[in-house]
């Protein structure tokens, strides 16, 4: 925990909470009038706190030093569920089935394509940070604690990363790589098979429209009415509207201009 000047406390690590906890409160959620539950990413994240970057402070933003992947946005395997979330007899597929069949609640899954884990500036390289694994647990990519400009275009372990930074020390996934696109899109299809009813897309504006068009086309070829909405943090409605065009994937967006007005 991190303490503020007036005794406030902010937690930057795991505090429990799992599928069973949500399911145990499904009736309460349903009685409040909700029809769906949106979970932050459920993918496997590194277990340790990140030792690099700028140390996180109370009330600070865009700082990752000392933080863990409790939030789920630092995936190192897009097919593997994080061990903190399931329990015996309650996989993600079983969770979505029970939410739907017993409570009439749909499941919205948060997905990421822009980045993986924090990947460089660690004093000593840490397990799972900067790494990406396939469905069988084989290492596909490794940032090797190198700054983006030091990545080697001739090293196959660096193929999945752009050679320039984007957000803090997060690995900047290279959506122009066909193998990476296949890896990501197939992972999204896998989670739909496990019961996801819709996707909330993180940092959608950081990835070119062409990727989202390809992803949308492949998903809707199998699931024509599958709903997706993106987090494009911008207050310009004309900019946000570009995501919704069919040529750009026809993906809905969160209404940040309305949020600003409120």
Regions found by a protein language model. Give the residues of each.
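Active-site-adjacent "subsite" loops/lids of carbohydrate-active enzymes
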Residues: 127-140, 144, 148-194, 204
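Active-site-proximal helices and loops of the catalytic beta/alpha 8
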Residues: 96-104, 186-193, 197-262
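Short, solvent-exposed turn/loop segments enriched in Gly/Ser/Thr/Pro and often Arg
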Residues: 38-47, 111-120, 203-208, 231-235
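Aromatic- and acidic-residue-enriched segments that line the glycan-binding/catalytic groove
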Residues: 45-75, 113-159, 243-253
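Conserved, mostly hydrophobic/aromatic
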Residues: 29, 39, 78, 110, ...
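Extracytoplasmic/secreted proteins, especially bacterial periplasmic and envelope-associated proteins
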Residues: 17, 21-24, 91-94, 107, ...
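Extracellular/periplasmic catalytic domains that process cell-envelope and extracellular macromolecules
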Residues: 30-33, 98-102, 106, 122, ...
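N-terminal structural segment of carbohydrate-active enzymes
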Residues: 1-106
